[in-house]
């Protein structure tokens, strides 16, 4: 199994900041930070598990990147969309699982 270096795209950073801002409005500050840290850990885990995920067949996900793969978060609320280039796993977007059409 190969290990990749994870890079977070600008669009994914914006998505993450929007999610974190939303969490601050809904949860207490400590709970929101704990949730955000869990999401960061999941993103870091892509470095190890990137090869385990097959290319997506969803047209919506493929419109983001033609070689896109997806990883669903631990609570199945978020979808991390990424692709692999050379030694890098590049996270393209973080979307709500409810918005992904099959």
Could you say what each language-model-derived stretch is?
Residues 1-42:
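Arg/Lys-rich, positively charged N-terminal/basic patches that mediate binding to nucleic acids
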Residues 19, 49, 94-95:
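Residue-level signal for well-ordered alpha-helical positions
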Residues 24, 51, 96-99:
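A generic structural signal for secondary-structure junctions
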Residues 44-73:
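A short, surface-exposed loop/turn module that caps and links secondary-structure elements
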Residues 72-102:
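Enriched for short, Lys/Arg-rich terminal
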């Amino acid at each position: 199994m190969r290990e990749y270096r994870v890079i977070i795209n600008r669009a994914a950073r914006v998505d993450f900041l929007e999610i974190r801002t939303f969490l601050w409005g809904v949860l207490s500050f400590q709970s929101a930070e704990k949730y955000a840290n869990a999401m960061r850990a999941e993103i870091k885990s892509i470095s190890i598990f990137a090869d385990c995920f097959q290319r997506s067949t969803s047209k919506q996900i493929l419109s983001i990147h033609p070689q896109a793969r997806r990883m669903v978060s631990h609570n199945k609320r978020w979808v991390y969309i990424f692709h692999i280039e050379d030694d890098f796993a590049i996270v393209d977007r973080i979307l709500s699982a409810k918005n992904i059409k099959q």
